[in-house]
C-alpha cells in the first residue's frame, strides 16, 4: 500500500444542461442516426431501427456521451423493475389469497390471479384450498413476504404504492442525469469511489439494513406465526421497532440494548443471531435467525471491503497499482493495461460482470432448493421447480451475453498496437492451442458420455441388464461427489462445533424434514445415473464454451479472414467472390452458442426435475414411510436414452397433454402454441434469403396488378436478421414448451 499526498479537493464532475429535452426530436423515428432518420425506402429500415436504437456506439464515438446514455438507461431499467415489483405487490394486495395462505400454508396454495369469466376462461380458476379459486402461482412471493414479516394485504398495498413512487423517482433521475446534470467521463472512470459506494453502500449498508429489518421485524413476527398466532393479533412492524419491551418478551437479551455490543459480550445476542445449520422443522426453511446472522456478517465484510481503496484521502489501495503488480512467472506483463481496458471499454467491463452474474445466478438456482431460504418454500414443489428453472435459464443467457460483449470489445475497443505481451495478448497468441485442445475435450466428452448411454440402450434392447452400467450391474459410482457430500455432512462436528446440522440436508446423514406430511428436504443419494448425466452436463457446457470462446478469440482475425476486425461484429460473409466465409462473424458465434446453451440448460433442468420427483419430493406417512412422486425410478430409468424418452418426457407429459377441460388447460394450450413457435423458427433457420426474395417479388407483382403496392419496397430479411428471428423463436418456443410441461405436471402431482 502506497501512502500519497491527499488528492486536491473534489472536482466538479457534472456538466449542467448538456442536452436539451426535445419531444419533437424523440418523436422522429431513428433520430439517433442520419441514415435511419431519412425514413424508410425498404422494409429493412424497421429492422435497422430496432438493431441500432440501443447500440450507443453507433450513435457517437464520444465515450463520455456513450457513458451518459448507458447511465441514464440504467435508471430507466430500474424504473421498469420498480414498476414490475409494484405490480407483483399490488396483485398480492388486490387479487390474492395471501392472508388465507398465511393462516394455513401447508393446505392452501398461493394464488394472486383470478381470471374474468370471458368465453369460459374462468375454468382456469382452480380450487387452491380455503374456498379460493384462482390460478396457482409459483413465483415464491408469498414465501418471501412471510419471511419479511408482511401479515396483511394492506401492507402489500402500501409497499406497492412505495414501489410506484420509486419508479417515478428513477424515471426522473434518468432524465435529470442526462439532460440537467450529466456526469463527466472522469466520474465514470473513478473506480475507487465506485467501489467505495457499491461495496460499502449498496452491499454493506444494504445488507445491514436488511439484517436490521430481519431482527426487529421479521424474526418476532415469524416467531408468532410459527406459534400459530392469528396474523391480525400480531403487533404491527412499527410497534416492534418503537417498543423494545415487545421484543424483549421474545428475546430477553433485547432488554440490555446495545450494552453487550460495546462490552464485547456478544454471545448475549445468540438468541436471535444463531449458527444452527439445517432447516427449521416447522417451516422447512432455513432458520431465519441464521439468515439474520448471515446478513449482519456480510454487512461487516462489505463495509470493510468498501474502505480498502484510495479515494479523496491519501490512504488505501489504487486499483491500477494492484492490477499492474499482478504478474506470474508465465504471464509476461500480466495485468498491465487491464485498468485502461476496463475504464475505457464498457463492453469489456460488462462482459466480466455478465460472466460473474451469470455464474452467480446458476449458484442461486442450486442453493434455492438445497438451502431453501423462505418459510414453506421447500414443500411448494411448483415454486421450487420454477425457481430452479428460471435461475438456470437466466444464468445461461447472461453467460452467453458475456461472450457477446467480450467479442464486441475485441472488435470495437481492442487496440493491438498498445497491448503487447500482457495476459490478453498472450492468450490471443496461443488461441490455436486453446481452441484445438478444447475441441478435443468436446469430442472426448461427447463420444464417451453419449457412448455410455448407447451401450446401456443396446444392452437393454438385447435383454442383457447384467451388462449395463447401473447401480445393480456394472457400477460407475460418482466417488468424488460422494466424498464431497460425506465431508460436508460430517463438517459441523469439526469445523463448526456450535452448529447442530450441516449447511444442507442434501449432503447426507439421517435427517429428514417434512412439513404437513410433505417432504421438504432429505439427503440426496448420487449413483451411476447421476454419473452418466453429469458427463452430459460436462459435454454440453464445454461445447458452449468452445463456440463462445472461439468467437471471442477469433473476433478480430483468423487464418480464413485475416482482416475480420474491419468487417465488424456481425456480417454475413467476407464479400462476394470468397466462398466458404459465411457465418464466421463474432455475432454468428453468439448465435450458435445460444443453441448449445439451450441444450446445456435443458439437460440440467430435466435432470433436476426428474431427480427431485424420484428421490426427494413426496409424502410421508405417520409411520415415517416416504413415498416419492415417481417412486425412485431415476436410478434405473435414466441410464438409457429410451428411459429418458419413455419414463420422463412421455410419462410426465401426460398431465399437460390431458389438461384440456381442467384448470390446467392453459398449460395445454401453451404447450401446443409454444411447440408451434418453436417449429416456426425452423422456417427462418433452414431457409435461404433468395427463396424469400423471389417469393416477395411475386407478391409485389400481384399488389402492383391490383394497384395496392406500398411505397416502402418489401425486402427479404438479411441473413443475419433471419438468423436472429430464428434463434429468438427457437428459444422462446423451447422455453415456453418446457415451462408448460413442467408446471402442468408438478401442479397436478405436487
UniProtKB/Swiss-Prot annotation:
Chlorophyll a binds at residues 683, 691. [4Fe-4S] cluster binds at residues 573, 582. Its main location: plastid. It catalyses: reduced [plastocyanin] + hnu + oxidized [2Fe-2S]-[ferredoxin] = oxidized [plastocyanin] + reduced [2Fe-2S]-[ferredoxin]. It comes from the Eukaryota. P700 is a chlorophyll a/chlorophyll a' dimer, A0 is one or more chlorophyll a, A1 is one or both phylloquinones and FX is a shared 4Fe-4S iron-sulfur center. It is found in: Plastid, Chloroplast thylakoid membrane. One of its GO terms (molecular function) is electron transfer activity. Signal peptide: none annotated. One of its GO terms (biological process) is photosynthesis. NCBIfam families: psaA (TIGR01335). PsaA and PsaB bind P700, the primary electron donor of photosystem I (PSI), as well as the electron acceptors A0, A1 and FX. PSI is a plastocyanin-ferredoxin oxidoreductase, converting photonic excitation into a charge separation, which transfers an electron from the donor P700 chlorophyll pair to the spectroscopically characterized acceptors A0, A1, FX, FA and FB in turn. Oxidized P700 is reduced on the lumenal side of the thylakoid membrane by plastocyanin. The PsaA/B heterodimer binds the P700 chlorophyll special pair and subsequent electron acceptors. PSI consists of a core antenna complex that captures photons, and an electron transfer chain that converts photonic excitation into a charge separation. The eukaryotic PSI reaction center is composed of at least 11 subunits. PANTHER family: OUTER MEMBRANE PROTEIN, OMPA-RELATED, PHOTOSYSTEM I P700 CHLOROPHYLL A APOPROTEIN A1-RELATED. Belongs to the PsaA/PsaB family. This is Photosystem I P700 chlorophyll a apoprotein A1. It comes from Citrus sinensis (Sweet orange).
Amino acid at each position: 500500500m502506497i501512502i500519497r499526498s491527499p488528492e486536491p479537493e473534489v472536482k466538479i464532475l457534472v456538466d449542467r444542461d448538456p442536452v436539451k429535452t426535445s419531444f419533437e426530436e424523440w418523436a422522429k423515428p431513428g433520430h439517433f442516426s442520419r441514415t435511419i432518420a431519412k425514413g424508410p425506402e425498404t422494409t429493412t429500415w424497421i429492422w435497422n431501427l430496432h438493431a441500432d436504437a440501443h447500440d450507443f456506439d453507433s450513435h457517437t464515438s464520444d465515450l463520455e456521451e456513450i457513458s451518459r446514455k448507458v447511465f441514464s438507461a440504467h435508471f430507466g431499467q430500474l424504473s421498469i423493475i420498480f414498476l414490475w415489483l409494484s405490480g407483483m405487490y399490488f396483485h398480492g394486495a388486490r387479487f390474492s389469497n395471501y392472508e388465507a395462505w398465511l393462516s394455513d400454508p401447508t393446505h392452501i396454495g398461493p394464488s394472486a390471479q383470478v381470471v374474468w369469466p370471458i368465453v369460459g376462461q374462468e375454468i382456469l380458476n382452480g380450487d387452491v384450498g380455503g374456498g379460493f379459486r384462482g390460478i396457482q402461482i409459483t413465483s415464491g412471493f408469498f414465501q418471501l413476504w412471510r419471511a419479511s414479516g408482511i401479515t396483511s394485504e394492506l401492507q402489500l398495498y402500501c409497499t406497492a404504492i412505495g414501489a410506484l413512487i420509486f419508479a417515478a423517482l428513477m424515471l426522473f433521475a434518468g432524465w435529470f442525469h442526462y439532460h440537467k446534470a450529466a456526469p463527466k467521463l472522469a466520474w465514470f472512470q473513478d473506480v475507487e469511489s465506485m467501489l467505495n459506494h457499491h461495496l460499502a453502500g449498496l452491499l454493506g449498508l444494504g445488507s445491514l439494513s436488511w439484517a436490521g429489518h430481519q431482527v426487529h421485524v421479521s424474526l418476532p413476527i415469524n416467531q408468532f406465526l410459527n406459534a400459530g398466532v392469528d396474523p391480525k393479533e400480531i403487533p404491527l412492524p412499527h410497534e416492534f421497532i418503537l417498543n423494545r419491551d415487545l421484543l424483549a418478551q421474545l428475546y430477553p437479551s433485547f432488554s440490555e440494548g446495545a450494552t453487550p455490543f460495546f462490552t464485547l459480550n456478544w454471545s448475549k445476542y445468540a438468541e436471535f443471531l444463531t449458527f444452527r445449520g439445517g432447516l427449521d422443522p416447522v417451516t422447512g426453511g432455513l432458520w431465519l435467525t441464521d439468515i439474520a446472522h448471515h446478513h449482519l456478517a456480510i454487512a461487516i465484510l462489505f463495509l470493510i471491503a468498501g474502505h480498502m481503496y484510495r479515494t479523496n484521502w491519501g490512504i488505501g489501495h489504487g486499483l491500477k497499482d494492484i492490477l499492474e503488480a499482478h504478474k506470474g512467472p508465465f504471464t509476461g506483463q500480466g495485468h498491465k493495461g487491464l485498468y485502461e481496458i476496463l475504464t475505457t471499454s464498457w463492453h469489456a467491463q460488462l462482459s466480466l460482470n455478465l460472466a460473474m452474474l451469470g455464474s452467480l445466478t446458476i449458484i442461486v438456482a442450486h442453493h434455492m432448493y438445497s438451502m431453501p431460504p423462505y418459510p414453506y418454500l421447500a414443500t411448494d414443489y411448483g415454486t421450487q421447480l420454477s425457481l430452479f428453472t428460471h435461475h438456470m435459464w437466466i444464468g445461461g443467457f447472461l453467460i452467453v451475453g458475456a461472450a457477446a460483449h467480450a467479442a464486441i470489445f475485441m472488435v470495437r475497443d481492442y487496440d493491438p498496437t498498445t497491448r503487447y505481451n500482457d495476459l490478453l495478448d498472450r492468450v490471443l497468441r496461443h488461441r490455436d492451442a486453446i481452441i484445438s485442445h478444447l475441441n478435443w475435450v468436446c469430442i472426448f466428452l461427447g463420444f464417451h458420455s453419449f457412448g455410455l448411454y448407447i451401450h446401456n440402450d443396446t444392452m437393454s434392447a438385447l435383454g442383457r441388464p447384467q451388462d449395463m452400467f447401473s447401480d445393480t450391474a456394472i457400477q460407475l459410482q460418482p466417488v468424488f461427489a460422494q466424498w464431497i457430500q460425506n465431508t460436508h455432512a460430517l463438517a459441523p462436528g469439526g469445523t463448526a462445533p456450535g452448529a447442530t446440522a450441516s449447511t444442507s440436508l442434501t449432503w447426507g446423514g439421517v435427517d429428514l424434514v417434512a412439513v404437513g406430511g410433505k417432504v421438504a428436504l432429505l439427503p440426496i443419494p448420487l449413483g451411476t445415473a447421476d454419473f452418466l448425466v453429469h458427463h452430459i452436463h460436462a459435454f454440453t457446457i464445454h461445447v458452449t464454451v468452445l463456440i463462445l470462446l472461439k468467437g471471442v478469440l477469433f473476433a478480430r482475425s483468423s487464418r480464413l479472414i485475416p482482416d475480420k476486425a474491419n468487417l465488424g461484429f456481425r456480417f454475413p460473409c467476407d464479400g462476394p467472390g470468397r466462398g466458404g466465409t459465411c457465418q464466421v462473424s463474432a455475432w454468428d458465434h453468439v448465435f450458435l452458442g445460444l443453441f448449445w446453451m439451450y441444450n446445456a440448460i435443458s439437460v440440467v433442468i430435466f435432470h433436476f426435475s426428474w431427480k427431485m420427483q424420484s428421490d426427494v419430493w413426496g409424502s410421508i406417512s405417520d409411520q415415517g414411510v416416504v413415498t416419492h412422486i415417481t417412486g425412485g425410478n431415476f436410478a434405473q430409468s435414466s441410464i438409457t436414452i429410451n428411459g429418458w424418452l419413455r419414463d420422463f418426457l412421455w410419462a410426465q407429459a401426460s398431465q399437460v397433454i390431458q389438461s384440456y377441460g381442467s384448470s390446467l388447460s392453459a398449460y395445454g394450450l401453451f404447450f401446443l402454441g409454444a411447440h408451434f413457435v418453436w417449429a416456426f423458427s425452423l422456417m427462418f433457420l433452414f431457409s435461404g434469403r433468395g427463396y424469400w426474395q423471389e417469393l416477395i417479388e411475386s407478391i409485389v407483382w400481384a399488389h402492383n396488378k391490383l394497384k395496392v403496392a406500398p411505397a416502402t419496397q418489401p425486402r427479404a430479411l438479411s441473413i443475419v436478421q433471419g438468423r436472429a428471428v430464428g434463434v429468438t423463436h427457437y428459444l422462446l418456443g423451447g422455453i415456453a414448451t418446457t415451462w408448460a410441461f413442467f408446471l402442468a405436471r408438478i401442479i397436478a402431482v405436487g
